[in-house]
Amino acid sequence: MTKVFDATKFRKSITKSIQGLGIGFSDPTDWISTGNYALNYLMTSDFNKGIPLGKVTVLAGESGAGKSYIASGNIIKNAQDQGIFVILIDTENALDEQWLQALNVNTSEDKLMKLSMSMVDDVAKTVSEFMKGYKDQHADNKEGAPKVLFVIDSLGMLLTPTDVNQFEAGEMKGDLGRKPKALTALVRNCVNMFGDYNIGLVATNHTYASQDMFDPDDKISGGQGFIYASSIVVAMRKLKLKEDLDGNKVSTV
């Protein structure tokens, strides 16, 4: 009779030898609605579940598609209703307190921390420093640790040191491919750091028109690397309202 393999010793051995090793499954336990039943179902096959904690979600689309409204409005409001603390990183300098409050977002310091930054390196350092302190405080009690959601609006406006240096020198030659690599590294590290904790990230990004006549769909800026690294990517676009027989614009399907 074949003996059953006992993985107890092996599990203890690799746990001691590999720092930060995760064993077992880390399925999401907390979900935040996007405020749109159709979008929730598209993302998770559940009308009430949208953004999962422990994952990285990207909403990409053209200007006016509603990315900021959903990410910085609906999702933050619904997260706060669930007792989740939100860290909002504004890279576009476009999120006004009055606009957020009009969307029923609680802007008090005990519910929301708003940070304004423009460098992708600064965003990475901010997330890294937060995770170091978070892990030190809650390493022994992951289930009882506070729930946190990062919102970045948007990835497309982030700059690299190369962008800044060239602007100051008056030489606009592009970032030489550094930004796609930096965004990929940012998303990949966030996915790895958040997996075992009740921490999530939702970010918006821009799209641009495709130059390929055989592939006319809009392309997401920042390269393909971070798209594959993200847990969920939603491509959005804006459509005109339909008109009824009397010429009135309607939003019904």
Q: PLM features: residue spans?
A:
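Conserved inter-motif catalytic segment of the P-loop NTP-binding fold
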Residues: 62, 74, 78, 82-185, ...
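Glycine-rich, flexible loop segments associated with nucleotide phosphate handling
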Residues: 50-57, 142-150, 175-179, 221, ...
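Amphipathic alpha-helical transducer elements in NTP-driven molecular machines
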Residues: 32-36, 53, 68-69, 116-128, ...
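The Walker A/P-loop phosphate-binding site
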Residues: 2-110, 123-132
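Residue-level signature of catalytic and energy-coupling elements of molecular machines
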Residues: 39, 100, 153, 205, ...
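Active-site phosphate-binding and catalytic loops of NTP-dependent enzymes
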Residues: 48-49, 84, 136-141, 195, ...
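Phosphate-binding/switch region of NTP-binding enzymes
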Residues: 176-253
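Structural motif
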Residues: 55-57, 85-87, 148-150, 200-202, ...
